[in-house]
């Protein structure tokens, strides 16, 4: 599939003029199936490239916006026409979770902030996406989030305590404000590569060419 690119800036160098490794910033929401598919596209595109992947939160439906319901016509239609065909093409196992209404993701992103602090933001994001779309687990449930956190090396009780105390709430809210007000994110997945914005799930081969041309 094609993807849209919005040019902002070009490469970044360190103080000595050395070109830094390319960085892919991925704005995501853990209840967006295309975000899981985008991750696989990125993996395929960057298999032999020097690229660093950084995840950033963007809640598609922050409180009080209602979340989606499985019984509404919209979700089954989108999955039938877009999600499942793309997942098959990329080789990603995925299922429409039978959880209705879909969970909010603010708590999941609070745990992401904790995971980032401990250097496991990337594996946590992948585990959260897979928990929802491959295991049909409710990622709005603190106990489920504690399980996910523990699976990537966080202390389970520390996750529960942090959620109960709202320890990372403001940090997540600040990240959400940044995504909306400064980065001007409107949809996910959105990739930012060396300052260039790519919206949607990229074709792995096209993304690889895009990275090599700017490498």
Regions found by a protein language model. Give the residues of each.
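C-terminal cap of thioredoxin/glutaredoxin-like
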Residues: 16-19, 25, 34-51, 74, ...
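Cys/His-enriched microdomains
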Residues: 30
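Structural alpha/beta surface segment adjacent to cysteine/selenocysteine redox centers
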Residues: 36-135
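N-terminal amphipathic/basic-hydrophobic helices that include classical n-h-c signal peptides
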Residues: 1-19
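Solvent-exposed beta-strand sheet faces enriched in polar/charged residues
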Residues: 25-27, 56
């Amino acid at each position: 599939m094609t993807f849209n690119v919005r040019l902002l800036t070009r490469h970044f160098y360190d103080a000595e003029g050395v070109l830094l490794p390319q960085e892919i910033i991925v704005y995501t929401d853990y209840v967006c199936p295309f975000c899981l598919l985008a991750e696989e596209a990125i993996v395929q595109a960057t298999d032999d490239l020097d690229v660093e992947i950084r995840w950033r939160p963007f809640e598609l439906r922050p409180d009080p916006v209602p979340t989606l319901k499985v019984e509404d016509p919209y979700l089954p239609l989108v999955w039938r026409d877009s999600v499942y065909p793309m997942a098959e093409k990329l080789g990603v196992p995925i299922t429409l979770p039978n959880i209705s209404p879909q969970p909010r993701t603010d708590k999941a992103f609070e745990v992401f902030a904790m995971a980032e602090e401990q250097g496991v933001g990337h594996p946590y994001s992948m585990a959260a996406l897979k928990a929802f779309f491959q295991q049909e687990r409710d990622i709005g449930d603190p106990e489920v989030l504690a399980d996910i956190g523990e699976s990537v090396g966080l202390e389970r009780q520390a996750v529960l305590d942090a959620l109960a105390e709202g320890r990372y709430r403001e940090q997540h809210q600040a990240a959400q404000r940044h995504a909306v007000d400064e980065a001007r994110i409107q949809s996910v997945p959105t990739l930012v590569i060396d300052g260039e914005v790519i919206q949607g799930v990229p074709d792995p081969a096209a993304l690889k060419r895009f990275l090599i041309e700017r490498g």
